From Swiss-Prot:
Membrane topology: Multi-pass membrane protein
InterPro entries: Brnchd-chn_aa_trnsp_AzlC (IPR004471), Brnchd-chn_aa_trnsp_permease (IPR011606)
Keyword Ribosomal protein included in the entry's annotation: no
Cysteine pairs bridged by disulfides in the record: none
Location within or outside the cell: Cell membrane
Full protein name: Uncharacterized membrane protein jhp_1251
Listed transmembrane segments: 14-34, 42-62, 130-150, 156-176, 192-212
Pfam families reported in the protein's UniProt record: AzlC
Keywords in alphabetical order: Cell membrane, Membrane, Transmembrane, Transmembrane helix, Transport
GO annotation terms (biological process): L-valine transmembrane transport
GO CC list: plasma membrane
Species name: Helicobacter pylori (strain J99 / ATCC 700824)
Family: Belongs to the AzlC family.
Length: 228
C-alpha cells in the first residue's frame, strides 16, 4: 500500500492539466445527456464502463435517434479504432502488470496514452503503480465531471458550443511538452507531415485513423533512421 501511495503522489501532478480538461468536457457530456432526459445514473454508468469521450458524445445522438444496436456497435468501432494503435504500442509496458492489465487497457484514452508516454516515474517508484495511478486519476476526473454536469444540467440549461476545443488545446500543450523534452524531433515532424497530408487527402471525417496507421507503419519501417 505504501508503494502505491508513493506512485500515486508521483503521478498526481502530471494529471492536473487533464483534470481541468476532463472536468469541462465531462460536465459538457453530462449536461447534454441530461437535456435528452437521462439522469445521473446513466451518466455514471457510461463514464464507468464506456469511458470514451468521443463515443459517449456520439451515443447521445444515437440514443436520441433510437439507433439500432448494430449501428451503435459499428459507429463505436469506427470512432474508437485508433485505440488499437495505442494498445499495440503499450504491449511491452503492460505485459507484467498482472491483475491491473484489464483496467489499464480499459482506461487507455487519448490523454492517458499521451501522459504515459510523456512522463516516467521517479527513481524508486513502481512503474506499474505509476501507470495505474495516472489511469485511475484521469478516469476519476471524467466520472466526476460527468456527474456534476448531469446534476447541473438536470436543473439548468447551458450553451455548450465550442467546449470541444478544450481537449484539442490540451493535446497541443502535451505535444509541446514532449517536443521540448526531446532533442530528436524527427518523430514529431514525421507525425505532423503525415497528419497534414492525410487531412488534405481524406478530410476531417476519415483522416485520423488513416494517419495513425501510417504513423505506426512509418515508425516500424524507419525506426533506425528516426533514432539517429
Amino acid at each position: 500500500m505504501h508503494d502505491f501511495l508513493k506512485a500515486f503522489k508521483d503521478a498526481f501532478p502530471h494529471t492536473i492539466s487533464i483534470f481541468l480538461g476532463y472536468l469541462l468536457m465531462g460536465m459538457t457530456f453530462g449536461m447534454l445527456l441530461a437535456q435528452q432526459g437521462y439522469d445521473y445514473k446513466v451518466a455514471l454508468f457510461m463514464s464507468l464502463f464506456i469511458y470514451a469521450g468521443a463515443i459517449q458524445f456520439v451515443a447521445i445522438t444515437l440514443l436520441s435517434a433510437q439507433a439500432s444496436l448494430m449501428n451503435v456497435v459499428i459507429v463505436s468501432l469506427l470512432v474508437n479504432a485508433r485505440q488499437t494503435c495505442y494498445a499495440l504500442s503499450m504491449l511491452d509496458r503492460f505485459k507484467n502488470t498482472k491483475w491491473r492489465l484489464p483496467y489499464l487497457a480499459h482506461a487507455l484514452t487519448d490523454e492517458t496514452f499521451a501522459l504515459l508516454n510523456l512522463y516516467a516515474p521517479k527513481k524508486g517508484v513502481n512503474e506499474t503503480d505509476f501507470m495505474f495511478s495516472i489511469s485511475l486519476l484521469n478516469h476519476s476526473y471524467w466520472i466526476f465531471g460527468s456527474l456534476v454536469g448531469s446534476l447541473v444540467g438536470s436543473h439548468f440549461s447551458f450553451d455548450t458550443q465550442g467546449m470541444e476545443f478544450v481537449m484539442t488545446a490540451i493535446f497541443i500543450v502535451l505535444f509541446m511538452e514532449q517536443y521540448k523534452r526531446n532533442t530528436n524531433h524527427k518523430n514529431a515532424w514525421l507525425g505532423i507531415a503525415i497528419a497534414v497530408v492525410c487531412l488534405a487527402l481524406f478530410g476531417t471525417e476519415y483522416f485520423l485513423l488513416i494517419a495513425l496507421v501510417l504513423m505506426v507503419l512509418a515508425l516500424i519501417l524507419f525506426r533506425k533512421q528516426l533514432e539517429c
